[in-house]
């Protein structure tokens, strides 16, 4: 007996109890897949959808189909299709990273970047939605950075993760590296065309994670630094075609930029200690408009007795309110009846309206401000540093772009 779901994934619009699904152009096996990742103020939604079965998947699924009626079929073709999809979905991008990769290890069980492949060719899409979440008109299919090479039988896809109020989207696309074969790189989508953020061959992987209404995008790029594959945060001006990498907490710190607001404040996650074998990471805030600005550890912006260790900043709005992921110690009773402590992942909301204008140095009893050469002006410090007010805490459902 087998259970077959109606689809792999569906992009869902939800508002006040109303739910609308977005269906893909191609649904031949397992119902296809769609995702809605972002929506702007005009109801223009960004995401991706299956558009065709890949050549490799067609071949593998065909191998599961008997050529004659006498062959005993032990499982339906849907089981074969699902096993193929599951294997591709969890495959690692081993061609880009021959070394162990400790930072951001949740990308795959082996610690490497997930290739996040599919039985389908997938394309980034923009859907115009009405007030009820229904698609208006014809969706806009987005391109890839390069066309698929003739001998490449794998899925070849693009993905839109963010869209601004000017209709410019950002995300990822498969492309080709001269030495590494197929890789995923950051892409900007303008009028359906996929545009590269960089063509520098030192970069092996990357993504655009957000774009503001000034057409400045942010995300990460992966490159080999000191014989290790590490990520570097970046901002990219679409109008000026200018890429700027972020400094990180220290030289060689793996950094991922997750979001940028219209004031140019970037938030994300980065390694904070260069000397440890297993590097801890922290959520950061960075003013990309300030010359010589340095990363601000968000743990320095909350009170020293706060029970949270902020490990990642996920988003920031134009009021400076940050949604972040934190660890919180929690006691529990084990099977032997003993009290134990474990870290629980929670989401915290940080509000700059509670600013006190000082960074906390929790190693000093007097809790004095130790700026260590930070170059942000006093106005910025007052506006963004004092994020001491914890507004709400709730369980996090994480989203990862591989």
Segments predicted by a language model, with ranges:
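Residue-level hotspots at or immediately adjacent to binding/recognition sites across diverse folds
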Residues: 1-380, 391-399
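N-terminal secretory targeting and juxtamembrane "stalk" segments of secreted and cell-surface proteins
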Residues: 384-386, 399-402
